[in-house]
């Protein structure tokens, strides 16, 4: 008889699809028009650091260079148990893995003024680390205030309905 052919428990499924890092500020500063889930090319020590939750997406952005999607300014801390020789540069440019048609579609959108690609989160999908990137349009201060006001009104409405 084979081993492990049964169903996974709920805890095992949750661990296999775990959020590793989230860029909450991006949803405040940008209006997200479209999202795309991509793979990411990491070194061994980077994988260990990301799984330990040592990644910061706050200043990150994506560029398309030579037909490839690259992730810039994402800080992944050096692994604590690796020697200095084997460790990675925390701010190195990392390649994102997406299909050609997806990259071409994003390139077409980026030619419009004011749009940018930003990393929204890093998460596990099975044993693979994935990056969700978003096509965003920068918000002005009055847009941020309006969005916060709408959010507050929705919350108050939801709370009022829950009370009665």
Swiss-Prot record:
Disulfide bonds: none annotated. SUPFAM superfamilies: Small protein B (SmpB). GO terms for molecular function: RNA binding. GO terms for biological process: trans-translation. Its main location: cytoplasm. It is found in: Cytoplasm. One of its GO terms (cellular component) is cytosol. InterPro entries: SmpB, SsrA-bd_prot, SsrA-bd_prot_CS. Keywords: Cytoplasm, RNA-binding. It comes from the Bacteria. Signal peptide: none annotated. Required for rescue of stalled ribosomes mediated by trans-translation. Binds to transfer-messenger RNA (tmRNA), required for stable association of tmRNA with ribosomes. tmRNA and SmpB together mimic tRNA shape, replacing the anticodon stem-loop with SmpB. tmRNA is encoded by the ssrA gene; the 2 termini fold to resemble tRNA(Ala) and it encodes a 'tag peptide', a short internal open reading frame. During trans-translation Ala-aminoacylated tmRNA acts like a tRNA, entering the A-site of stalled ribosomes, displacing the stalled mRNA. PANTHER family: SSRA-BINDING PROTEIN, TMRNA-BINDING COMPONENT OF TRANS-TRANSLATION TAGGING COMPLEX. Belongs to the SmpB family. This is SsrA-binding protein.
